[in-house]
């Protein structure tokens, strides 16, 4: 299985998890010239921009580097501008390891 297919499977799994947690999925794989946002979801009137990372033999969170956060932040700014979003938002990470999901909210504050 190639990495693109694994990524799509992880995002599908993440969407199921997020819906079960009360999120409404607004968009998937939003592409901007600055980068890609895996999932954009809404919960409690807050827009969540979610980066999905998965892995079995390592800690997937370590793939979210300062450079990646910078690219995501630019893509989020572009999305907010083009969609005229003025409500609260945050950048989250959804980590999938060994079939378990962990949502880490506001990763830019870590």
Swiss-Prot record:
A GO molecular function held by the record: nucleic acid binding
UniProt superkingdom: Bacteria
Residue ranges crossing the lipid bilayer per the database entry: none
InterPro entries, per the entry: Restrct_endonuc-II-like, tRNA_endonuc-like_dom_sf, UPF0102_YraN-like
Gene3D superfamilies noted in UniProt: 3.40.1350.10
UniProt xrefs under SUPFAM superfamilies: Restriction endonuclease-like
A Pfam family it matches: UPF0102
Matches recorded under NCBIfam families: PRK12497.2-4
Family label: Belongs to the UPF0102 family.
Protein name: UPF0102 protein HH_1751
Species this protein is from: Helicobacter hepaticus (strain ATCC 51449 / 3B1)
